[in-house]
Amino acid sequence: AIHHIWVTIAAEPFYGRKIILRMYWDGEKSPSVESPIGDFFGVGHGLNRNLSSLPISCSSEGRARNCYWSMPFIRSARITVTNEGKEPVGAFYYYIDYRELPELPLDTPTFHAQYRQEMPCRPGNNYSILEAYGRGHYVGCNLSIFQTAMGWWGEGDDMIYVDGEEFPSLYGTGSEDYFSDAWGMREDENPFYGCPLQESDFLVGSKATVYRFHIPDPIPFKKSVRVTIEHGHANNRSDLYSSVSYWYQGDPHRPFPQSPPVEKRLPFALPSPGNLRFPEWEKIEDGEFEAFEDKTSGLRVRSQHLTPSLSSFYNQTGARYPQLMTEKVTAGTFAEISFPVEIGESYDIDLFFFRGPNMGKIIAKGIRAGSLSTKLEANIFDGYSS
């Protein structure tokens, strides 16, 4: 039986979602474990985060991954990794620790883990974490959320159906309650539950990963188990969900559905517009306004209540897009952008805005160069679009 797996990887950004881990027991053709490697080790979205739980732990800023699930087998075990990214993996180091046992009962259940996603979640239907058929016991999951609307993503009731029942024998009271926390989620780690990732702003694009392990309280089933959770109260949200479920059951198991392609697993890794350079903002004095200047280009932005921050979106190199936020604004609030130019040169100006239910409508009103002023047509950007 395998008792411990350790890996550390050097690869392109978001490799945790691009490298697929599979495990096969006793010569089976269909894997009993199939998941992006980062999600299997408890952290979603292809990101690296520390995590400390009983069966899974990650350290070194999430780059050292350890698994302690017991994985028995009778005759053989085969573990594979497949790189579905565009670049070769620079380094892949691993240990797999196992012991030869005198014997195992023939009905010993084997370890299973499956990645699923629904992007976006469908109205009127619970998100399905696991559907398994046979005899075994469910031992937990992790769930990753990418917000498509602002606010609290939770309040979805968990519903677990055992052996084909029409009404769930386990019916919870809210997302954070199933994941053993309360009054929302915050980053925390415990032996059987925790939250390695919760971006604090709860804005469009914010990401979270939570976990719950039923080790002292496994959920047994004789014929089948179906583990589901609402996405928002009464399924009123359409966030992007992904998960890994963990369970033990006797083989053969039903084959898993085909894993979604890598680009579908990374909806937040946005391609950069051409010639885009991230600014280095420095606050400057500008009377009653908030003003920031890019230390490299000299570009300045001034407005009321202006705050630089990092957005929840990443480019394809793994860097988060910076943003300037204006808060406490009303109709007519303005932001003024200025930058040095060379006399006689021509310039194209491209403005990029994030969209979301709290982003407002933006009107580009005109360009002023010294004593010259150029009026633009009322070019309205509807930031309320999703």
Per-region residue spans from a language model:
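Beta-strand-centric surfaces of beta-sandwich/beta-rich domains
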Residues: 1-276
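Extracytoplasmic
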Residues: 162, 268-386
